[in-house]
């Protein structure tokens, strides 16, 4: 919440949100917290920036992916940033199935509503000191 206003944080896990609130301390009161599955999230709010740090790769059913994209197209007025496992990343995460993406696949999924700006891959070191390769892509709403 460093200088930004009107921040919303959404996660399927109430426990994860509680941990984030504790890390922010008193600044947590400045954030709108939502416990929800992103594939069922409905809002009339427009967001200047939507940052998905690692949810998209957990959407494994075509309907989930399409619901996510439809929600983003409705809710994003500015920029969308997605971090997802690359083709060099793990096949599962936290025991759950995931989908790996390459730059072309992610851009193709988003092309109906977003212009791709930049994509990059990077290794992320987990708390267990293992490496996971991520693909990060940024988009601008058409």
For each predicted feature, which ranges?
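Short catalytic micro-motifs in class I SAM-dependent methyltransferases
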Residues: 54-58
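Class I (Rossmann-like) S-adenosyl-L-methionine-dependent methyltransferase catalytic domain
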Residues: 1-45, 59-142
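A conserved beta-strand element that flanks and buttresses the S-adenosyl-L-methionine
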Residues: 51
């Amino acid at each position: 919440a460093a200088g930004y206003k009107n921040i919303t944080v959404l996660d399927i896990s109430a426990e994860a949100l509680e941990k984030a609130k504790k890390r922010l301390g008193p600044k947590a009161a400045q954030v709108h917290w939502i416990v929800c599955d992103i594939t069922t999230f409905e809002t009339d709010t427009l967001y200047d920036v939507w940052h998905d740090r690692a949810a998209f790769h957990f959407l494994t059913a075509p309907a989930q992916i399409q619901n996510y994209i439809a929600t983003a197209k409705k809710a994003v007025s500015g920029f969308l940033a997605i971090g997802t496992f690359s083709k060099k990343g793990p096949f599962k995460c936290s025991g759950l199935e995931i989908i790996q993406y390459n730059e072309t696949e992610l851009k193709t999924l988003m092309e109906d509503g977003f212009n791709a700006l930049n994509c990059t891959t990077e290794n992320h070191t987990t708390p267990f000191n293992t490496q996971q390769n991520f693909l990060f892509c940024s988009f601008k709403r058409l």
